[in-house]
Amino acid sequence: MTKLTARQQQVFDLIRRAIERSGFPPTRAEIAAELGFSSPNAAEEHLRALARKGVIELAAGASRGIRLLGIEDAPHQFTLPHAGLMQLSLPLVGRVAAGSPILAQEHISQHYACDPALFTSKPDYLLKVRGLSMRDAGILDGDLLAVQKRTEAKDGQIIVARLGDDVTVKRLMRRPGGLELIAENPDYENIFVKAGSAEFALEGIAVGLIRSGEL
């Protein structure tokens, strides 16, 4: 990999850890806060330097539009030939009715054309976030969470799950006897799901986030 300064390596490693932990990269503000920069603008300068060195790619106009480049084991990376020239058409899922598939036609309010560089893996749909239970992971009310359909997920990944009649976004952790769905906000309680519960179904994992107003 291209030789980086110590500070650039810190930024690069932070991006990599964030993608491994949550499925999507940090915002400029999160980088600044984590590494003690004076402002998000300082983080932006380091990101541009990394882009010039060819180790990341920046998507214009997106707070989390950062992709790792030039390493074979980059976590969950989504690559397409000539990705900058292509667009993904993704359905936006609003409220989900009890007992019906999450991608049922009646749940889809519209489709968005999105730059593939916004996501760490190819998403299947966008889910409009409701509430602040994942606030401390940078997921806010009204955000659009990019979701890849999966039937399995790793510990620490942010998932979309069906619990009975509800659909929720939480961080997954395996515990003795079941699963814990962890909220990233101390005002919300975690949810324990017993092993084999018929009430639980994994709908997918988070692979990107679009802040309200970025599309």
From Swiss-Prot:
DNA-binding region: 28-48
Taxonomic lineage from the root: Bacteria, Pseudomonadati, Pseudomonadota, Betaproteobacteria, Burkholderiales
Classification via PANTHER family: LEXA REPRESSOR (PTHR33516), LEXA REPRESSOR-RELATED (PTHR33516:SF2)
Subunit structure: Homodimer.
Entry similarity comment: Belongs to the peptidase S24 family.
Residue numbers annotated as active site: S133, K170
Protein name as it appears in the record: LexA repressor
Provenance organism: Burkholderia ambifaria (strain ATCC BAA-244 / DSM 16087 / CCUG 44356 / LMG 19182 / AMMD) (Burkholderia cepacia (strain AMMD))
Keyword annotations: Autocatalytic cleavage, DNA damage, DNA repair, DNA replication, DNA-binding, Hydrolase, Repressor, SOS response, Transcription, Transcription regulation
Role of this protein: Represses a number of genes involved in the response to DNA damage (SOS response), including recA and lexA. In the presence of single-stranded DNA, RecA interacts with LexA causing an autocatalytic cleavage which disrupts the DNA-binding part of LexA, leading to derepression of the SOS regulon and eventually DNA repair.
Membrane-traversing stretches: none
Biological process per Gene Ontology, one example term: DNA repair
Matching NCBIfam families: lexA (TIGR00498)
Record gene name: lexA
Site positions per UniProt: Cleavage: A98, G99
Catalytic activity: Hydrolysis of Ala-|-Gly bond in repressor LexA
InterPro entries: LexA, LexA-like, LexA/Signal_pep-like_sf, LexA_DNA-bd_dom, LexA_repressor, Peptidase_S24_LexA, Peptidase_S24_S26A/B/C, WH-like_DNA-bd_sf
Listed EC numbers: 3.4.21.88
Gene Ontology molecular functions: DNA binding; serine-type endopeptidase activity
Root EC class: hydrolase
Pfam family membership, one: LexA_DNA_bind
HAMAP family linked to this entry: LexA
